[in-house]
Amino acid sequence: VTGGRGKRLTLLALCLSGTLLFGALGIWQLQRLAWKRDLIARVDARVNAPPVPVPPGVSWSTLDLDDAEYRRVRARGHFLHEKETLVDAVTEDGPGSWVITPLVTAEGTILVNRGFVPPELRDSALRAGGQPDGDVIVTGLLRRPEPGGRTLRANRPEDERWFSRDVAAIAAARGLEAVAPFFIDADASPVQGPAPRGGLTVVHFRNAHLSYALTWFALAGLCVAGLVLLVRPPARPEMAGRQA
């Protein structure tokens, strides 16, 4: 009897703990859902807003990228095409490369993702018509850097193999100084001849918090059902005999 009672108390403790734990996780996921919806709304407003001047160079060291990312910005300067970097990419056009080119501005140097090129246009000599000289105005989305590379594919600067837009590493490999801690995803712009295709930024945030919350609450409900079964008094033998 004592052993059975101890087992029952253990099951009660487990069900109670599960109810509290799974319920707390469900509430946490609802909070994350509210945060994600707010984030999506704020980013959507930034993406569709008129472009604003790029953050001044004096603010770069303290720039809050969470607040600045995906803002539409505008920068004026000239490109250093001889220092461009090709980063592996897969887009709606298939596999290819992002063309990352330093833009020298009055505020400092900003890396610009000018757009996508297919494998046959990796050589810059084949797209000379898309290499603007002199002062240009670039508009696009401010993006946070992508340090290190991708999962299982680390950047290898020594081999000119780039799998992510790692601002600091690209700047170091190209000998650039006073570089912004962000890059700009350039908008699409009409140019003559073969050129990088801009405006391919995909703004998408996975939002599965509601399904996660429902899962946790369902598990909490199962634990509650277990509690009910455990605390419900067992049927008396005479009552069971009568029913039989």
Regions found by a protein language model. Give the residues of each.
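Surface-exposed, charge/polar-rich loops and edge strands
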Residues: V1-A244
